[in-house]
Amino acid sequence: MQNQKIRIRLKAFDYRLIDQSALEIVDTAKRTGAVVRGPVPLPTRIERFNLLRSPHVNKTSRDQMEIRTHQRLMDIIDPTDKTVDALMKLDLPAGVDVEIKLQ
């Protein structure tokens, strides 16, 4: 797997989970001898919603809610076969979405 790069993108609603998962991935990759760039924090995506409090009248009375999606980006440069196997066996929390691209 010479001259290849693995790009890992993590998404989660809880920043503690995503930081913990990023640390596990970095430790695993470094243990197998790969070079890691990151984790780089990407901008947090904030979705805001307005909901009517009352089902009938009082149009001006509303609740405001938001969902924050935190993102991290990592590059693993010159991964070995051991690196790929270790990353495949890695168990991450359920609230973290992982996207892996080979470049």
UniProtKB/Swiss-Prot annotation:
Gene Ontology CC terms: ribonucleoprotein complex; ribosome
Keyword Ribonucleoprotein part of the UniProt annotation: yes
Domain of life: Bacteria
GO molecular function, a single term: structural constituent of ribosome
One Gene Ontology biological process: translation
UniProt keywords, alphabetically: Ribonucleoprotein, Ribosomal protein
One Pfam short name: Ribosomal_S10
Chloroplast listed as a keyword: no
InterPro entries (UniProt xref): Ribosomal_uS10, Ribosomal_uS10_CS, Ribosomal_uS10_dom, Ribosomal_uS10_dom_sf
Function: Involved in the binding of tRNA to the ribosomes.
Summary of subunit composition and partner proteins: Part of the 30S ribosomal subunit.
PANTHER family reported for this sequence: 30S RIBOSOMAL PROTEIN S10 FAMILY MEMBER (PTHR11700)
Family membership noted in the UniProt record: Belongs to the universal ribosomal protein uS10 family.
Record-given protein name: Small ribosomal subunit protein uS10
